[in-house]
Every structure is written in structure tokens, then in C-alpha cells.
């Protein structure tokens, strides 16, 4: 059972659970819950990498979405109420957040998603008196969390509003592209990539990835863009509603993802 306590003294509408053991990995995650102040709940957001949402001090790399003022502003201007359920990542993130492992490796990501939806989300909704059937449902993530948001919607199609910010496609390429056909036909896919995300690779992509991938290997920035655009193209070919943002000068961190997220949320 999840037990929630104060997350941060400056954020009195956000609560954090105790660490929850992922028995498959032997590592832990926490759950954060954010509820709107003085607003009826109209939207639920399931988010990954919760540690990077609300607090710079609690973030992994010193960047964070600064999500509370973003949501509060939208709630006031658009008469909405966002209920957020978010799960933190851990030291096994590359296993727990990769729904497309290669060579028959165990799929820890799908097991993690299933534990969220089958065990923890129902308890949270019950504790906070949230009726999911009446809400607009969003799943969001960035980088590897962007892969998780896509896979989550495939496994739990009621969460049909997908926000995938700079998805780390190379962890699951071409599996993620081939899996898109399994999305709910009512899915709306919001995808973005920046033009300056090259540093995330740490080396020339020609030295890292198979050169027979049908992507642009001319430089690291173009490689990232071409991979995300490949997902976009496949979505469009399959007839899914797709919103795509190519962020000029956009880098691979939450500071740059924040305005893109706001634009996507406005459209949902």
C-alpha cells in the first residue's frame, strides 16, 4: 500500500510516497501525486521521471520542468484541473524505461507499466476519489520516458493522449516504429525533438549505431531529428493524429521541453 507524505514545503498540493520495490529489478521507485487547488479535476496526467517535474533540488541533473506554475497557469486560463500521478526513475533506468530490449532480454519496462496500472494507479485514484472514466487521459515522458509514454498508451489505450518529448528512439529502434500500429486508433500523438540534442550521445553516432539503419548519420543532431521524424512519418502513414514540433535550438533537457509541453497541453 502506498503511503503519502509532504513532498516539499513550498508545494502544498504535491505528495510523495515511500519507496516502492520493483521486485523484478531489486530497485525502488516513488510515486508523486499532484492535485489542483480549488479546481475540479478535468485531466489526469501519468508522467515518468517524476523527480524532474517539480523541484530543481530533487532533479537528476539540475534541470526540471517547473511543472507546478505551468499547470497552475493553464488551470486558471483554461478552466482546467490537472491531477498528476508520476513515478520516479532509478539507477536501473535503462532497463526499466526501455520497452524494446534487444536479443530476447527481459522486458522490465512493460512489467513496470503493468504494476503502475494494475496495482498503484487504482489505489491512488481510490484514495483521492478520482473517477478515471470522466477525465481526459494523458501520458507523458521525455527521452526514455518518451518511449515509455508510447508503450503505455499501447498497453493501456484509454490513455490515448501521448506526449513524447525527444524520445530516445535508439534504445528501441526499430522496435518502437514497428509497434506503433498497435496504438489505439483514437490516439493523439504529440512528439517533439530539438535541433541541438547531439551531446546526449557522447560520441559520433557513426561509431555507436548500425550503419544500416535508415537514418541520417551526417551528424548527431541530424541523427536524432531523423529518428524522431521516422516515428512521426510512421504515425502519419498509419493514420494517427499527430502533432509534431521541431524546436529550433532545442536541447536535451527539461528547460527546453517546458514550452513544448505547454503547447501540447494546450491542445489537449
Descriptions of predicted regions:
Residues 1-268:
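Non-catalytic cap/lid and distal C-terminal segments of serine-dependent acyl enzymes
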Amino acid at each position: 500500500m502506498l503511503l503519502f507524505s509532504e513532498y516539499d514545503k513550498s508545494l502544498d498540493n504535491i505528495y510523495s510516497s515511500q519507496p516502492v520495490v520493483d521486485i523484478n529489478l531489486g530497485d525502488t521507485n516513488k510515486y508523486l501525486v499532484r492535485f489542483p487547488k480549488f479546481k475540479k479535476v478535468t485531466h489526469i496526467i501519468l508522467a515518468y521521471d517524476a523527480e524532474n517535474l517539480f523541484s530543481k533540488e530533487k532533479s537528476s541533473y539540475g534541470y526540471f520542468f517547473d511543472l507546478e506554475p505551468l499547470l497552475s497557469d493553464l488551470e486558471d486560463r483554461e478552466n482546467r484541473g490537472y491531477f498528476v500521478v508520476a513515478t520516479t526513475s532509478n539507477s536501473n533506468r535503462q532497463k526499466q524505461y526501455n520497452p524494446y530490449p534487444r536479443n530476447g532480454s527481459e522486458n522490465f519496462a512493460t512489467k513496470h507499466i503493468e504494476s503502475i496500472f494494475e496495482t498503484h494507479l487504482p489505489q491512488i485514484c481510490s484514495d483521492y476519489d478520482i473517477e478515471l472514466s470522466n477525465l481526459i487521459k494523458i501520458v507523458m515522458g521525455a527521452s526514455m520516458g518518451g518511449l515509455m509514454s508510447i508503450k503505455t498508451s499501447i498497453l493501456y489505450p484509454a490513455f490515448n493522449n501521448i506526449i513524447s518529448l525527444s524520445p530516445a528512439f535508439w534504445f528501441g529502434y526499430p522496435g518502437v516504429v514497428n509497434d506503433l500500429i498497435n496504438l489505439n486508433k483514437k490516439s493523439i500523438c504529440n512528439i517533439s525533438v530539438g535541433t541541438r540534442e547531439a551531446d546526449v550521445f557522447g560520441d559520433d553516432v557513426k561509431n555507436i549505431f548500425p550503419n544500416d539503419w535508415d537514418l541520417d548519420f551526417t551528424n548527431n543532431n541530424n541523427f536524432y531529428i531523423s529518428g524522431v521524424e521516422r516515428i512521426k512519418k510512421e504515425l502519419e502513414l498509419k493514420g494517427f493524429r499527430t502533432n509534431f514540433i521541431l524546436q529550433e535550438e532545442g536541447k536535451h533537457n527539461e528547460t527546453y521541453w517546458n514550452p513544448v509541453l505547454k503547447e501540447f497541453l494546450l491542445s489537449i
